């Protein structure tokens, strides 16, 4: 069994790898050769946390996996991300665990890739403005991934705590895109 710690994930997978994997699994799901099992998510009655399991199976690639994790709203004050998860991969023929993988970076990359795949296939080709609602941990991942899909001319964003938009503004500047913080009504 392989154990891949969180600290090693970013060096092992790129945004393009994530995009390709998500696009492939979306295609497999549309073809009904891959599917998700029902999600289990519950409040644990401690630390105001939500905890759950997401799992799925790809019959063609024989990928069987489970993500265990949740949301701990007090983690930011402890220097941790609020979302915490671990991924388990299993041998589809035997059920034996093949790998335990740190899931926080993978979750952010997968979520960003899903947004990017959606934009690549569904957004207007001439889209010029990217609107973002929310500035949580995954927002910068999503901005980078989605910005690669169109020739956006500017980014507009809203967050219920406007001071948290600075990380998105920094990424927009890194990408050479003007950034504007807007009210919910303006968005």
Residue ranges and their predicted role:
Residues 110-130, 137-149:
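Short internal alpha-helix immediately C-terminal to a glycine-rich phosphate-binding loop
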Residues 2-4, 147-151:
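Acidic/polar active-site rim loop that often engages polyanionic ligands
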Residues 175-187:
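Short acidic low-complexity segments
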Residues 132-133, 158, 182:
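Structural motif
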Residues 149-175:
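NAD(P)-binding Rossmann-fold cofactor-contacting core
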Residues 1-107, 114-116, 126:
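N-terminal ligand-binding/catalytic initiation module
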Residues 14, 18-21, 111, 138, ...:
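General structural feature for long, well-ordered alpha-helical segments within catalytic domains
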Residues 2, 154, 178-180:
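Conserved beta-strand segments of alpha/beta enzyme cores
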């Amino acid at each position: 069994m392989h154990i891949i710690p969180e600290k090693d994930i970013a060096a092992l997978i790129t945004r393009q790898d994530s995009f390709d994997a998500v696009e492939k699994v979306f295609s497999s799901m549309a073809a009904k050769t891959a599917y998700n099992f029902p999600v289990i998510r519950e409040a644990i009655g401690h630390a105001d946390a939500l905890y759950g399991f997401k799992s799925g199976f790809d019959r063609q690639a024989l990928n069987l996996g489970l993500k265990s994790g949740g949301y701990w709203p007090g983690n930011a004050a402890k220097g941790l991300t609020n979302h915490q998860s671990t991924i388990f991969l299993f041998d589809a023929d035997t059920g034996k665990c093949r790998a335990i993988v740190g899931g926080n970076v993978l979750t952010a990359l997968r979520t960003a890739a899903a947004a990017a795949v959606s934009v690549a296939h569904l957004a207007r080709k001439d889209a010029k403005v990217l609107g973002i609602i929310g500035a949580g941990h995954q927002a910068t991942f999503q901005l980078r991934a989605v910005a690669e899909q169109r020739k956006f001319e500017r980014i507009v964003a809203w967050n219920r705590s406007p001071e948290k938009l600075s990380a998105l503004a920094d990424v927009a500047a890194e990408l050479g895109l003007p950034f504007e913080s807007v009210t919910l009504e303006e968005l």
